[in-house]
Amino acid sequence: QEREFIYEIFEEICGARLTTNIGRIGGFERDFNAVAFEKIREFLKRYPPVLKEFEEMFVRNRIFIERTSGVAAVTPEEALDYGWSGPILRATGVDYDVRVQNPYCSYEEFDFDVPVGATGDVYDRFMVRNEEMWQSLRIIEQALEKIEKEPKGVFHAEVPDFYLPPKEQVYTNMEALIYHFKIVMGEVDTPKAEVYHAVEGANGELGFYLIHDGGRSPYRLHFRRPSFVNY
């Protein structure tokens, strides 16, 4: 039921439940509407009781603890050797979160805690993920407050060389049409460079490694997927 409500929020924001393709270089494809804000506020009110009920069922459940405590324990050294990241790495006691060590998207402006385990067993992995849901609620609440303070209609950076102009401008403005053509036809040249950027995904570090040789398409693009490494 709660997951369905989250899908409704996604659909209200970007028009799709799963393929949430709203992000663009320097911002978003469109601004959030009033209904989306209302749904997010409702979610912030209705989800904490669900989490508390969830905790009552598992956190102090003797059967659950006996089946998870001490099971499949992994040391910090082993986790690092495996290349783990995200919640399962932090469950071993390694305090590493991309949002804190290499902040992006204004994460340095948010106040939240990074839950860290001690034994690296199944119970600690569960507890880390459980606490991260609480921290996510804190981040969402702060982000919502910051967005509401921003000027209305400002949802992307002014970078016409890389950001597709609105369709209505393409049909009526020659400059917008030129930028649209350059981006779509791949006529935006970029310098020779090599870059790696990562974000903190739900399952760990999601990285993007890009090599460019100066042409109009990447020489090499590789995705560092956390699930592939973790499992």
Q: Which positions does each model-derived feature cover?
A:
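Metal/cofactor-centered catalytic core regions of large enzymes
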Residues: 1-231
